[in-house]
UniProtKB/Swiss-Prot annotation:
Keywords: Cytoplasm, FAD, Flavoprotein, Methyltransferase, Multifunctional enzyme, Oxidoreductase, S-adenosyl-L-methionine, Transferase, tRNA processing. One of its GO terms (cellular component) is cytoplasm. The gene is mnmC. One of its GO terms (biological process) is tRNA wobble uridine modification. Its main location: cytoplasm. The lineage of its organism: Bacteria, Pseudomonadati, Pseudomonadota, Gammaproteobacteria, Alteromonadales. This is tRNA 5-methylaminomethyl-2-thiouridine biosynthesis bifunctional protein MnmC. Residues 1-262 are annotated as: tRNA (mnm(5)s(2)U34)-methyltransferase. In the N-terminal section; belongs to the methyltransferase superfamily. tRNA (mnm(5)s(2)U34)-methyltransferase family. It comes from Shewanella woodyi (strain ATCC 51908 / MS32). Catalyzes the last two steps in the biosynthesis of 5-methylaminomethyl-2-thiouridine (mnm(5)s(2)U) at the wobble position (U34) in tRNA. Catalyzes the FAD-dependent demodification of cmnm(5)s(2)U34 to nm(5)s(2)U34, followed by the transfer of a methyl group from S-adenosyl-L-methionine to nm(5)s(2)U34, to form mnm(5)s(2)U34. Its cofactor is FAD.
Amino acid sequence: MPNMRRRVNSLAQECEKNTQMNQETANFSEFYRLLSNIAVGKQSLTFGQLGLGSVEQLLAVHSWLSSAPTSVRIKLKVFEAQLDTLPLFISQLSSYTPPSSKQGSFIQTLTEADPIEILGCQRLIFDDGRFVIDLYLNSPIASLKSMRLPTCDGSDDDKSPLFDLWTISQTNSNRVESGMEQEISQALLWQVAKVSQDSAPVYNFNLKQGKEIRQLCQKTGFSLISYRSQNEEMTPKLTSDLSSLDTQICLQERKALRHAQAQDSLYTPVGQASSETDSESDTFAIIGGGVASAHLALSLAQRNKTVRLFCNDSSLAQQASGNKQGAVYPLLTPDNGHLSHYYQQGYLFSRRRLQSLIKDGFKVGYDFCGVLQTGFDQRSSARLEKIITAQPWNKQIAHGVDRHESSNLAGIDIDKAGIFYPLGGWICPHEFTQAAFDKASQLSDVSAHFNTDIKRIEQREGKWYLHKTTVNTGGEQTFGPFNTLILANGQGLNQFNQSKQLAATGFRGQVSHIPARNELLKLNTVLCSHGYLTPQNDGVHCTGASYIKNPEHLDYSPSEQAENLEKVKQSYLGKAWTEDVDISDHSARVGVRMVTRDHAPMMGCAPDFDVISLNYQNHQHTKESIKYWRETPAPIHQGLFILGGLGSRGITSGPLAAEALAAQLCGEIIPLDNATLELLNPNRMWMRKLIKGKAL
C-alpha cells in the first residue's frame, strides 16, 4: 500500500506539473499571438532570445508558427552563457507531455537532433527549413560581437536580415540558473541593438530584473514589452520613454556599430546573390555533382530557390563522393581553435542532415557506430595524446580510451590507447549525395543537366554564362544568363580562368574493398590510424586511402592496393585479424579530393586574383600597404562563388559549408562567426600575407 500511495502521489504530481506547463504554454501562445502584427507583410522573421528559457517558451514559438501562414518562416537565435543549462533543458523537453501530436513530433525531432554543450553556433533545421534554431553557447556578448552581418541598414524591411524582435528569457526554478542574469548589461544590449532592425522591440519575461532591463532598453533605444506580473492579467505592457531626439541618437549609434564592424572585415568579403524579381537570371547555377553541390542545392531549396546543377557525369557522385563508405568524425587540434570548432559543428550538422533525410524516407547507408583513432607510430601516438589531454572535450565529441577499452569498443584486438568519437561512424557518400538532391527536388524547382562538361565560364554585363563544347560539331552550347554561379566541382575547382589560382591541390585516393570474413566480421566501429577501416556493409569493408599529389591517371593501381594493406598491418602490428584483410580481388575505387594546406574547406566569394596581383604591385611590404589591404574591399568576381577544397572529410565538413554558403547567398546571418568565415574564405592564403605586410 505505501508503494501504491507513492505511485499515486507521483502520478498526481506529474499530472499537476503537466497541467501547469500546458497552461504556461497557453499563456506564451497568447502572448505571441499579440505579436502577430510584427509578421504582417513578412515571409521571414528573425527572433533573438537571451537565455535558453523554458520548454514552454520554445514550444510557444513553434505553436505560433504552426498557426501562421505556411509561407512564413522563423529563424530563432538563442544565446545562452552557461553550457550546463543545455542538458537539463533537453531532459525537461524529453519528459514534457505535449498538448498536440504536432508538438510531440517537434519535441521528438529536437531531442533526436542531440544538441551538445560545446562553444559556438549549432544550427537545427525543422519543417524543411521553415523553422531554424541557431543555438549559440558562449557569452552572448562575445557571440554577437563575432556575428557577421550582411550589408544592410536598420530600416524595417521585409528582406532585412536583422532581428525583428528579442526576448529576454524568464528564469526557471526547475532548471540550472541561466547565466543571463549576470550577462544583461548595457554593453550587451548595444550589441543586440547593432544586429536589430530599428523598430525591433524587446519582450521581457525576466520579472526579477524588470526595472533594470527597462532602464537598459531606454539607454539603447529599445521599446520594451513586459508582463506586469505572473499573477496579473497576461497583458503585455509597452514601455518607451525615449524622446524623438534620444531615439535618433540611439539609431545613429547602432549604425556606427554596424559600420565599424563592416570596416574590420573588408578583406574577408561576404557577398550575396543579386535578385531580380520574376527573372530567369535568379536561378542559381551550380557546377558539380558531389556532396557539396547536392547539399547546397538542398539548402537553397529549403529557401524556395530555383537551382540548376551542371554535372559532367551521367549521374551524381561519380567522382570523390562516390565511395561506398566514408568516416564521419571531427578534426580536433590541441588548441581547439577555429578549425577544430568548425569541424565539431560540421560533424554535428552532417549527422542531423542525415537523420532528417532518413526520417523523410530516403535510403542512405550509415552506422553511427563511433570512430576509434589510434597512432601508428610514436609520433602520431604522442600527437593524439596531446590532443585529448589539451582540452576538456565534451565526452560526446571525443574522449580518451586505454588499450583495454579500445579492444572492447572495436570488438577485435586493438590493444592501443587512443581517442574515441562516440557520435561518429560512417555514411555512404554517394547515397548521401543522391538523397540530398532528391529532397531538394521535392522542395523546390531543382534539376540537373547531366553529361554536361562545362569548359568555360564568362561574365557579360553582370551575368554569368556557361559554355559546353558540343561533341558532334565542335561548337559551343551556352547556358545562362545567371546572376549567381557556384563552383562546387571537386577536382575541377580550379579549371577555369577565374578560379585557376585557388590554393587547392588534387590528391588521388584509392579506397580498397575488402570482403567481410572471419575476425573482421566482429569489427563494430570505424578504425582510423594510418588510414581507415570500416565495419562491413553489404559484406564489404573499405580501407585506405592512398594519397598521390597531382595524379596522372585514375586507373586502378596494384601498388596502391598493396600499400593500403600494409597501412593496416603497420597500424595494428602483430594482430592476427589483419591476416583477414584480403586485397586479392583487386576491388577498389579511385577518386581525387581537393586539399587545402590548412585543411579548411573553401566557401565564399570567388576572389579576383588578377586584380589582387595588380594592386599588389603598388601596395607591398610597408605599413601603408598593410593599412590598404585591411581597409580596402578585397577584389572578387561579382556573382561567382566557391564551395570546395573539402579534402578527405567532405561528408563531415561539406554539408555545413553548403548551408553557410546558402545563408550567405540569400543575405542571411551566416551560422558561423567572423573568424571562421575568414578561415574558410577562398582568398585567405593571399590575404593572410597581405594584411601582415608579407610578400604575395
